[in-house]
């Protein structure tokens, strides 16, 4: 690393790969503090608001989302908002990016951001600044971005494709006290199985002798969840599931049987954004847009109404990962209950054309689209309850208490992806991991 930092090569990138417990966090925390003392400029980035908050806490330095730093909103256009790659006005700055396994490079059709390829845009932005370089860090055993087989930002060949000189380091030795941590012991075993491509039988989870990993029968779930909520709070407890359908069942049960919430939406409800939204933050400096996966807490529910065959609510939200930033939005209630990640395409289209009919008197298509862009119902925020989420949604975050429900498992589900899923879920927990209704044959 010292060679990279002292090198005069501006086209170099440092790739720091490390598994759970190998000291990545401590190393980068020390690096950031040292750079500060040497008055060497650094900027910390992460793919999501929650990941940026976690990064900032352990580095003792402000951290931002990648999108916040590298994109800027284009001036008013006829279509919906677009963000272009920003000009990098910094000089001789090291950009340190955590949780790089989450950085996608699949060109997303209809993406509002730059080329739609986040890694391409990040590299273009950083190296357009005089003397600026990139340090990418992450864990290759974690889930790759949705739709990709591997995490492109953690592979040297992908980075060499930009004409960059890649300096890579792999931290493999576990330095945290593995003997005392069942989470770490099992996570290390899982990533060894992934590395050896030994993913053809259900992995045995070692529980005996460890205080931080517990098997939880279904009949103790409500009492244990309740105890975690009372002791550590809603924001330090999460249920991780394999599907949105399963997460829905949990969310419904938690709200009814533990939190005693009778209304569809109550003050204090914990929500997760289900789809990027650019409308409600257009005039706000604190957030450029509301990203898919961000968490929000309901501060006030004012009124609900039914229109176009959908249900909406005027709600004040607080975003805990953005210094409790408060925002008033119109929210689509229907997505709270769908088994899909957000409103299904057919329903989205139905909403679009229903709202469009309101502007049928406007004959110029461009003017009609302007009206759609400014319509609070078409732009209603799509959310889900956030007491239980899928593993992709939990990635980048950490909680004191993680309840893991892997659902019914058979050999046909055994793929490297399942092992990455399990590894990613295990490493979300900083305190206790509860294995809910785990099959006896998988426990040792």
Where are the regions that the model predicts?
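Short, solvent-exposed amphipathic alpha-helical segments in soluble enzyme
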Residues: 60, 254-258, 419-423
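Short, conserved phosphate/pyrophosphate- and ester-handling motifs at nucleotide-, phospho-/glycolipid
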Residues: 48, 243, 396
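Amphipathic coiled-coil/heptad-repeat helices and related helical stalk/stem segments
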Residues: 1, 28, 81, 115-119, ...
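C-terminal accessory regions
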Residues: 307-444
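Conserved helicase motor core of P-loop NTPases
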Residues: 1-5, 9-11, 126-132, 140-299, ...
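ASCE P-loop NTPase helicase motor core
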Residues: 13-201, 206
């Amino acid at each position: 690393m010292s060679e990279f930092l002292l090198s005069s090569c501006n086209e170099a990138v440092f790739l720091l790969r490390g598994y759970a417990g190998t000291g990545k966090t401590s190393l980068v925390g020390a690096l950031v503090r040292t750079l500060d003392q040497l008055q060497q400029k650094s900027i910390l980035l992460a793919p999501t608001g929650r990941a940026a908050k976690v990064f900032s806490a352990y580095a003792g330095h402000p951290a931002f989302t990648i999108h916040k730093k590298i994109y800027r909103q284009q001036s008013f256009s006829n279509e919906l908002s677009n963000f272009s790659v920003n000009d990098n006005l910094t000089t001789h700055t090291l950009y340190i990016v955590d949780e790089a396994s989450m950085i996608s490079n699949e060109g997303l059709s209809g993406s509002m951001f730059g080329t739609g390829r986040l890694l391409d845009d990040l590299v273009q932005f950083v190296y357009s600044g005089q003397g600026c370089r990139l340090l990418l860090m992450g864990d290759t055993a974690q889930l790759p971005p949705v739709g990709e087989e591997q995490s492109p930002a953690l592979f040297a060949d992908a980075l060499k494709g930009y004409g960059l000189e890649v300096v890579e380091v792999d931290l493999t030795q576990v330095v945290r006290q593995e003997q005392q941590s069942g989470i770490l012991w099992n996570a290390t075993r899982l990533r060894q199985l992934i590395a050896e491509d030994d993913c053809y039988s259900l992995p045995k989870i070692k529980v005996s002798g460890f205080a931080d990993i517990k098997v939880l029968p279904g009949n103790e779930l409500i009492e244990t969840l309740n105890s975690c909520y009372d002791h550590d709070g809603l924001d330090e407890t999460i249920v991780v599931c394999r599907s949105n359908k399963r997460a829905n069942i949990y969310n419904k049960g938690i709200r009814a049987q533990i939190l005693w919430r009778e209304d569809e939406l109550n003050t204090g409800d914990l929500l997760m954004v289900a789809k990027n939204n650019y409308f409600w933050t257009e005039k706000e400096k604190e957030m450029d847009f509301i990203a898919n996966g961000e968490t929000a807490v309901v501060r006030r529910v004012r009124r609900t109404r039914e229109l176009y065959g959908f249900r909406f609510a005027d709600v004040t939200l607080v975003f805990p990962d953005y210094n409790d930033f408060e925002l008033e939005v119109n929210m689509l209630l229907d997505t709270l209950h769908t088994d899909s990640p957000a409103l299904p395409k057919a329903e989205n289209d139905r909403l679009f054309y229903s709202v469009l009919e309101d502007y049928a008197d406007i004959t110029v298509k461009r003017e009609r689209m302007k009206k759609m862009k400014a319509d609070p119902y078409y732009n209603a925020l799509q959310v889900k309850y956030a007491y239980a989420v899928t593993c992709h949604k939990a990635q980048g975050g950490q909680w004191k208490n993680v309840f893991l429900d892997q659902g019914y498992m058979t050999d046909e589900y055994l793929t490297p992806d399942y092992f990455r899923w399990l590894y990613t879920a295990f490493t979300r927990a900083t305190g206790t991991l509860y294995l809910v209704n785990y099959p006896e044959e998988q426990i040792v």
